[in-house]
Amino acid sequence: MSSRLPALPLSRRQALLGGAGSAAALLLPGGAQAQTRLQITEGNVAPMPIAIPNFVAGTPADNEVGLGVAQVITNNLKRSGLFAPIDQAAFIERISNIDTPPQFQSWKTINAQALVTGRMTKQGDGRLKAEFRLWDVAAGQQLTGQQYFTSPEYWRRIAHIISDQIYERLTGEKGYFDSRVVFIDETGSKERRVKRLALMDQDGANVRYLTRGADLVLTPRFSPSTQEITYMEFGQGDPRVYLFNIETGQREIVGNFPGMSFSPRFSPDGQRVIMSLQQGGNSNLFVMDLRSKSTTRLTDTPAIDTSPSYAPDGSKICFESDRGGKPQIYVMPAGGGGAQRISFGEGSYSTPVWSPRGDYIAFTKQGGGQFSIGIMKPDGSGERLLTSGYHNEGPTFAPNGRVLMFFRDPGGNGGPSLFTVDISGRNEQKVPTPGFASDPAWSPLLS
């Protein structure tokens, strides 16, 4: 295990937090026995009241980072829609020592069901030590606890990792906070719009620009390792698909095909890129092996086949095709052949993407003058629209498959913004970005 978090961008899932005992459990005697858990369904869920005091400062110099970590955790859990952080002004007990049990009655009085306590301490070697404990207030018992070591500049990532620990322990599902989003940053007027490839934390922090905006870029997608991004760029001549290495900043073209290449996406094992290639007036799906550079044709129709997305186990592909007259969603084996249409509602369907859990396919649906974001099961059943408006497009799943991010363009002289919504259709939230933003793609978990 690494001795510290790597420099930004964090792209290696195995490069976690450093030092001996970097993820050691912190359990007081009798801990981890309580059973508090939020029951998640696809209907309405009453958010769990949770108290998150500022993390205790190991030294006076650690006070600011202790406040910051608590605030990031609070914002993460609140934005999920599953938790209701209690205003700190209501707190009765002041946490000064996380090594002793809290006064549970004080937290029961303000109706907290769960309590998070923590401490941030700068070590003699310059590293930052982060500790936290999660408590079941009703049972008066500790649920879990961990400690981590890292460089001080990575305190926000510590907060995201702790948020994931809390989310998983209280919901039974994996979290999604220690992840990133690649998107298209847009600036300037609509007539002279500049589009740059950009990277940020899932909450909008730590924005980093990967391209300068000299050429138009679209549809970025993460590799499973999060080390690379594939995207389409309009440079000199036809649009091409590229690979961009986040760690080195190097890029390379994916194949040198005649005509346009677009809508790229990695296979689940990261060894192949599937894309659409234009030949004549048609566009068909091809897959390229990144090691051998060999290319295999997957579809061969007088139509436009595009926007492919693999099932998480790599066995199937969903894609968009107008072979039936207007854009619809089809599913076929990953090796090609036997495509089956799964969308049959009114309107047209585009930009399908498979959930990391394999249970849903998200899509953009156009009809009745609106663009909607929806989900359906892989066999086409259970279609449900989550949000509608003038122009909603480009859904991407969070690593746990629970939340979708998409972009919305209100029209007029403005520009697009990023939003998230739960797969139940609840809890729509705007994602902060420096300017206009479109084409989001969520990374897998970084840890």
Curated annotation (Swiss-Prot):
Cysteine pairs bridged by disulfides in the record: none
Domain of life: Bacteria
Region (Disordered): 426-447
InterPro entries in the cross-refs: 6-blade_b-propeller_TolB-like, PD40, TAT_signal, Tol-Pal_TolB, TolB_N
Keywords assigned: Cell cycle, Cell division, Periplasm, Signal
GO cellular component term of the entry, any: periplasmic space
Signal peptide boundaries: 1-34
Alphabetical GO biological process terms: cell division; protein import
Compartment(s) where it occurs, according to its Swiss-Prot or TrEMBL record: Periplasm
NCBIfam families (alphabetical): propeller_TolB
Described function: Part of the Tol-Pal system, which plays a role in outer membrane invagination during cell division and is important for maintaining outer membrane integrity.
Complex and partners: The Tol-Pal system is composed of five core proteins: the inner membrane proteins TolA, TolQ and TolR, the periplasmic protein TolB and the outer membrane protein Pal. They form a network linking the inner and outer membranes and the peptidoglycan layer.
Family: Belongs to the TolB family.
Protein name (record): Tol-Pal system protein TolB
